[in-house]
Amino acid sequence: MSEIRVEVVYALPERQYLRNVTLAEGSSVEQAIVASGLLELRGDIDLQSNKVGIYSRPAKLADVLSDGDRVEIYRPLIADPKELRRQRAEKAKK
């Protein structure tokens, strides 16, 4: 069975984590994240609540990866985007 290389990334406002991992062909998004070691390094990553993607497109943990893919772990939103837009619009009126 051949191998694939993928990147796993997790970005915080103050720091970015980028891990290159080599996996067996047919590996999943979840397997790449586990192999990257980011779950142990960052206790705030919870795969049950954090969304993931491949090159900015939403993905599921079971999705199969291709060679050269970039797996992204997204942080939860801290504010509702609709509420923020409403607040900016009100502020602009003043």
Curated annotation (Swiss-Prot):
Which InterPro entries is this protein grouped with?
Mopterin_synth/thiamin_S_b, RnfH, RnfH_sf
- Gene3D superfamilies per the UniProt record, alphabetical: RnfH-like
**Could you tell me which Pfam families the record lists for this protein?**
Ub-RnfH
HAMAP family in UniProt: UPF0125_RnfH (MF_00460)
The entry's family comment says: Belongs to the UPF0125 (RnfH) family.
The name this protein carries in UniProt is Protein RnfH
| Organism, scientific name | Serratia proteamaculans (strain 568)
Lineage in the entry?
Answer: Bacteria, Pseudomonadati, Pseudomonadota, Gammaproteobacteria, Enterobacterales
